[in-house]
Curated annotation (Swiss-Prot):
Gene Ontology cellular component annotations, sorted alphabetically: periplasmic space
EC number: 1.15.1.1
The encoding gene: sodC
Leader sequence residues: 1-23
Stated family: Belongs to the Cu-Zn superoxide dismutase family.
Function: Destroys radicals which are normally produced within the cells and which are toxic to biological systems. May function against extracytoplasmic toxic oxygen species.
Official protein name in the record: Superoxide dismutase [Cu-Zn]
Catalytic reaction equation(s): 2 superoxide + 2 H(+) = H2O2 + O2
UniProt GO molecular function: copper ion binding; superoxide dismutase activity
Amino acid sequence: MIRLSAAAALGLAAALAASPALAQTSATAVVKAGDGKDAGAVTVTEAPHGVLLKLELKGLTPGWHAAHFHEKGDCGTPDFKSAGAHVHTAATTVHGLLNPDANDSGDLPNIFAAADGAATAEIYSPLVSLKGAGGRPALLDADGSSIVVHANPDDHKTQPIGGAGARVACGVIK
């Protein structure tokens, strides 16, 4: 009886693990600065209508910084241009959370780094999904995606990137 119960439980666990309903619900990005130094981590958790980000960053210059989802899971170059443009839908969109037209899906609120260079925040984005739920762009698509931190804050209106400046940190979302 005990062997049968253990076998049934093992079979049930295997079936549940393969279930699409229990697909990956969170992902992590290990963030690096352009010089390769550790700059912290970002956890992205699937929510019913978007994603919740938990950012724990370090080594930033004090003050406000833009953060965006970028379309490629590639932080291989020191300037992080390999991460591509912002995540976006198939439709033509423009940059900026304050833009009256549809903004691109990579747009996020600014983050603030304290005097010691640390930035800790939770941000909700209804614009993306880990796997494409609700028709939102998938962060974990075939070429992946990344989170990029910029040198300056985003004004949320100016094209193409809101005056955010250079890319200073990047992490591939996995």
